[in-house]
Amino acid sequence: MPDTITNKLQNSTVQDVIATKLARAVFAGFEAMFATFLNITLGAQSRFEQRQYHEVQSAMRERLQVYERQVKSVSEAVKVIAYAELSCPQTWQLAKNIYGNMVKNHENEPIAHTFFNSTFGAIWDDKKIRTVHLFVLKAKYRTQPRPYDSLVKRISLQHGFNSAIKTLITNQVFRVPFSNLNQDVATLQATLTQGAKQQCRQVYELINLNDGYIEYAYSHFYRNKACYLIGRCIAKNGDNMPFAIAILNTPKGLKIDAVMMGADQLSLLFGFARTYFMVDTDQPARYVDYLSVLMPHKQRFELFNAIGFIKHAKTEFYRYKVDTTKNSPASFKYVAAPGTPGMVMLVFTIAGSDHVYKVIKDKFSAPKTATKAQVKEKYNFVKQADRVGRLVDTHEFRYLAFDLSRFSEQLLQQMKEHIGSSLIISGKALILKHVYVERKMTPLNLYINDCDSKALAQVMLDYGRAIKDLAGANIFPGDMLMKNFGVTRWGRVVFYDYDEICPLTDCNFREVPQTQNALEELSSDSYFDIEPNDIFPSQFKVFFSANELAFNAFNSHHSDLFNAQFWQTCQQQVQQGYLPDVYPYKQSWRFK
């Protein structure tokens, strides 16, 4: 063996040696990143048990910084290691091949690939990147689903469904006891039985026959104030009903608050407007494989994103984008997205896609006065915030490539006119230097055009709730026009226009001063001083000026939003550290 190593060293070139060191440095950085990420995650249960909800938010913000911080650290180390070879494409291609062999069969090989891509991109400033230097599109870089048996435990129903449910709950290890375990188990058993009866007849029949089994994931899913137990009820023929059990830690002890059943209900929990979960696992890709079984309509990038691996989610999304575009009819073209054209963003989409692409315009329409840098800061603010189910998550891409032939002539003309500085056309490719990707929704101002009175009342109720949920999370949307809100397939209202978003506590909410005389009232100029952060809630009514029915429906539930006192009270609560309860499931699903 020593002779073999000696021979290899003697036969190595400088390029071989440097490429090997580059690969080792990136791999060491990846391992350090993953360890730090996991260490923060490991504290989730303790924070839940101690009801340290402010620390929960701090830990989430800290974890969001880990990846970029480690990429920066590795990039600096690599510059020292490589120096003369830093800009040599051949050295990097060799380093990629060596790195690929190093992480081959590694438990987290796909995420390790993404970390290499990120490091290379940080050093090469993205624009010089070629796919030969990246782990992206080739089939060998796409891992196939792997067994997840080591992640789950199964409980037989042979002793009865109620007994199995009690075993399921008592198998969970917490420092805090349940305040009323027997009542929780009885309610959970009855709710799951009824859910199976409605959603999966085969599972329901086997529950009654004490046949089949319950399967659950060993690792809990922590987010905000709750812990979620994920699993499914399975019949022997393979029919199954996924579930997610929400556990809260109340002053009296632990309490089962709700259970979500079926893939559709679980999708609400894993929605794109929610904060990321903390899941105690060193096998995230296998957890994504398992979650894909429970929610087969969810894409892999959505699930990686949900458990906090947001950079790898971008890699998975890019693959998804390329595949779906390639497999769609050639007649499907990128076009301007439905809705009112943005003053700050050019937004486009393609038929069959669930996403929109948003590019910051070169010049903003009046009265917008922000800069590109300020808009980017707003989007970063949202990334760090607790989105409380009311802010759409975004993926930020640099130098994202598209097939030029898939763009409509009309959209191409708009792009050249409004985002020319962000646009590169090279051969058959259209490349965007900077772009945000968001989930596509129906703009609220368009949604209400097709509503009957019942649907209008419901969506206006949720519109106000969305604004109040954001206020409770110390977030003020800024521009609250209906065109800046979207409606999900569940009829839930979320906000997606971030160029004026800010912390609620940065605002100065005021009532409009009374005029002193008729001249002031008739004057076209303001008769009182206004500071840049002054907000006048009484003027929010103008948002409904074109739709009296919508205003009446909104006002019947949320007239308090037009008063400065409401907002001032919210600010006081935020400053006092109050964190409102926001549930990622319907109130009707909560246990009584």
From Swiss-Prot:
Q: Which InterPro entries match?
A: AceK_kinase, AceK_regulatory, Isocitrate_DH_AceK
Q: Where in the cell is it found?
A: Cytoplasm
Transmembrane annotation, as ranges: none
According to its UniProt entry, the protein's GO biological process terms are: glucose metabolic process; glyoxylate cycle; tricarboxylic acid cycle
Annotated catalytic residues: D393
Output one GO MF annotation: AMP binding
Question: Which residues are involved in binding ATP?
Answer: A337, P338, G339, T340, P341, G342, M343, K358
Q: What GO cellular component is one of the record's annotations?
A: cytoplasm
Give the record's keywords alphabetically: ATP-binding, Cytoplasm, Glyoxylate bypass, Hydrolase, Kinase, Nucleotide-binding, Protein phosphatase, Serine/threonine-protein kinase, Transferase, Tricarboxylic acid cycle
Reactions this protein catalyses = L-seryl-[isocitrate dehydrogenase] + ATP = O-phospho-L-seryl-[isocitrate dehydrogenase] + ADP + H(+)
Q: Does the keyword NADP apply?
A: no
Enzyme Commission numbers on file: 2.7.11.5, 3.1.3.-
PANTHER family according to UniProt: ISOCITRATE DEHYDROGENASE KINASE_PHOSPHATASE, PTHR39559
- Family assignment? Belongs to the AceK family.
Function statement: Bifunctional enzyme which can phosphorylate or dephosphorylate isocitrate dehydrogenase (IDH) on a specific serine residue. This is a regulatory mechanism which enables bacteria to bypass the Krebs cycle via the glyoxylate shunt in response to the source of carbon. When bacteria are grown on glucose, IDH is fully active and unphosphorylated, but when grown on acetate or ethanol, the activity of IDH declines drastically concomitant with its phosphorylation.
Q: What is this protein called?
A: Isocitrate dehydrogenase kinase/phosphatase 1
State the organism named in the record: Pseudoalteromonas translucida (strain TAC 125)
